Amino acid sequence: MPELPEVEVVRRGLEEHLVGRRFTDVQVCHPRAVRSGEPEVLVSSLRDATVTAVKRRGKFLWLDFGEDFLLQVHLGMSGQMLVAEPGQVQSPHVRIRAGLSDGRELCFVDQRTFGEWRLEKAVPDPWAAGAGVASPKNFLPQNVSHIAADPLEAVFDAQAAVARMKSKRAAVKTVLLNQEVVSGIGNIYADEALFLAGVRPRRSAALLSRPTLHRVLQSAAEVMECALEQGGTSFDSLYVNVNGASGYFSRSLNVYGRGGEPCKRCGAPIKRVVVGGRSTHYCATCQR
């Protein structure tokens, strides 16, 4: 499942190619791609709609048309949003094709069919209001309104996030994965952030000091910014940007997926454990 950096890479690519473009036609090629609604409604709503913005919160991605609805895009396990010349994308896994006013087309390719496009009501962003930056432009899908702001957003309130973390007695790794506490951090970047912060994943968030929790959040932001610079993390060909290129942050991972291998910092073997049902990696020497 793509995490924040991978979704942000896609968002930036879509923003470059879609903003100001109008959907001239939409073809649903597979019903599962619109399983949360009627394909006919999606097609009629998007036809002649002009993209005004491409936005994201955590792992959630959506297109804004300046209307009372938004197009939420779930990438799922293998979803790809590719912008190409008409007919250039010949994959048998194309689920939706949308013609653009500049003559190109947007293709939603999804091999495993866990992803989808869905129309959602646009509602004011409660997290933006709480951070004191509310504006008429701060709208998001109704079903995302409970998702906390992520560490790379302008509306992110680190002190409030630390307070939410401090109220949880669960392992700090588990708390980092709670999208209502802080969004966008998945299994990969939680492990990497905790390594950078020097904190063991099983420690109770409630028992960590506020400065330590701030350090964990700052480390998460640093790790994800670094991943963004490298195009995200690609372990297979299923995660690509809008041009079909893969990211290469996987080469920079310090602990995730490296169980039994030597720590790049101290040489001790990386430990693999299960925390909250999730495979977790850490260095017992570098993390306390």
Swiss-Prot record:
- Name the reaction it catalyses: Hydrolysis of DNA containing ring-opened 7-methylguanine residues, releasing 2,6-diamino-4-hydroxy-5-(N-methyl)formamidopyrimidine; 2'-deoxyribonucleotide-(2'-deoxyribose 5'-phosphate)-2'-deoxyribonucleotide-DNA = a 3'-end 2'-deoxyribonucleotide-(2,3-dehydro-2,3-deoxyribose 5'-phosphate)-DNA + a 5'-end 5'-phospho-2'-deoxyribonucleoside-DNA + H(+)
Which cofactor is recorded for it? Zn(2+)
Pfam families, alphabetized = Fapy_DNA_glyco (PF01149), H2TH (PF06831), zf-FPG_IleRS (PF06827)
Output one GO BP term: base-excision repair
Query: Which UniProt keywords are given for this protein, alphabetically ordered?
Result: DNA damage, DNA repair, DNA-binding, Glycosidase, Hydrolase, Lyase, Metal-binding, Multifunctional enzyme, Zinc, Zinc-finger
Active site positions, chain numbering:
P2, E3, K59, R278
Q: Which SMART domains match?
A: Fapy_DNA_glyco, H2TH
Q: What is its EC number?
A: 3.2.2.23, 4.2.99.18
Q: Which residues bind DNA?
A: H93, R112, K168
Cite the InterPro entries for this sequence.
Answer: DNA_glyclase/AP_lyase_DNA-bd, DNA_glyclase_Znf_dom_DNA_BS, Formamido-pyr_DNA_Glyclase, FPG_cat, MutM-like_N-ter, Ribosomal_uS13-like_H2TH, Znf_DNA_glyclase/AP_lyase, Znf_FPG/IleRS
Quote the cofactor binding remark. Binds 1 zinc ion per subunit.
Q: Name one GO molecular function term.
A: zinc ion binding
Q: Which family does it belong to?
A: Belongs to the FPG family.
Looking up HAMAP family in the UniProt record yields:
Fapy_DNA_glycosyl (MF_00103)
Q: What does this protein do?
A: Involved in base excision repair of DNA damaged by oxidation or by mutagenic agents. Acts as a DNA glycosylase that recognizes and removes damaged bases. Has a preference for oxidized purines, such as 7,8-dihydro-8-oxoguanine (8-oxoG). Has AP (apurinic/apyrimidinic) lyase activity and introduces nicks in the DNA strand. Cleaves the DNA backbone by beta-delta elimination to generate a single-strand break at the site of the removed base with both 3'- and 5'-phosphates.
What's this protein's name? Formamidopyrimidine-DNA glycosylase
Organism of this sequence: Corynebacterium jeikeium (strain K411)
